[in-house]
Amino acid sequence: MSLAGEACGYDPDRTVKMVSGGPMMGFAVVGLDSTTKKTTGGLLLLSAGETNVTKTTHCLSCGKCADVCPMHLMPMNTVFYTEAADYEGAARMGGVLNCIECGACAYVCPARQPLIQSIRLAKAELRKRRAK
């Protein structure tokens, strides 16, 4: 077991989900060794009773994600364009490159859309394509 695991009280029999970075801006990780470094801000080790796994449904077009966005972006457009692999559309219509990845949109989404994951994917693809 890693030093981080020992410090956190990691129990592989109880832990069903690990989140690196905290509850709002963190991301799910597979293992402790590859994700913990001196810049890691937090590490959540969750048991089955501490997770609320809900299924993602189609976007309801409620606009809650846009209402809470501190950058006044349209996160719902990012998911739409990212699912279609139209990353330029995500930048143009969703403003994905201006996103600060605060997680507010994902927190309020009643459809549990993977907003932050879509934003991170679109940003990575855009940077990769524009670097060529």
Identify the function of each model-found stretch.
Residues 1-111, 117-123, 131-132:
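Redox cofactor-anchoring modules in respiratory/redox and cofactor-processing assemblies
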